[in-house]
Amino acid sequence: MIFIIRHGETQKNKKKLLQGRSNDPLNKAGIAQAEQAREYFQNRGVHFDRVYSSPLIRAVDTAQIIVGDTAQIITDDRLLEMDYGPYEGTSLEPPPPEVLHFFMDFVNHPAPEGMESLECVVGRLGEFMEEILPAAAEGGDILISTHAIAMKGALEYLTPASGGAYWSKYIGNCEVYQIGIRDGRYLVPEETGMKGK
């Protein structure tokens, strides 16, 4: 089983600022969220055989808190958050109009200049998911620690029939989805009881 998690809260999350490639650490609430996720997995007898993470510290630390020293964390740039370019660090209350239009109606509003496109996000996350599929199909549990938009990119790749439904869905800090595998193919991702805030 694959479990994909969004990192714990950072100060930029708390302040409602766009946080893409900036390398901000978890705040106290984020550390507590990751500890709660660790308990969630421990209570269900989940022991991770492989752990992948975005190289950004908030994702790595989330994974580290969850697995401790029981597994090596493999970082992969394809798990990075969307590159917001010149919009990095801007307020989401409210966001710039062009950013709001993009996130509310990405079909008719392409990514603002300098910002990574959703197609690019889905492409790199899809490439990553296909690369780990053979090993994942052998069994065992895998943890992927990443970011909200990157996580949505993976979920969109795995469920193309969703019609973009995941883009408008809120994914909270340390929210977890599980992805099963059958006959060498991914199953539809499912929400778990580990809901983010």
Task: Name these PLM-found stretches.
Residues 53-54, 123, 145-146:
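Short beta-strand scaffold positions
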Residues 162-188:
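Domain-level recognition of soluble alpha/beta enzyme cores
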Residues 66-124:
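Phosphate-handling substructures
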Residues 2, 140-149:
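Generic beta-sheet signal
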Residues 44-78, 156-159, 180-197:
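Conserved histidine-centered catalytic loops in small-molecule metabolism enzymes
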Residues 2, 9-71:
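Active-site-proximal alpha-helix that buttresses catalytic centers in soluble enzyme cores
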Residues 44-47, 132-141:
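Glycine-rich phosphate-binding loop signature in dinucleotide/nucleotide-binding domains
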Residues 11, 58-60, 81-82, 142, ...:
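Short, active-site-adjacent cap segments at secondary-structure transitions
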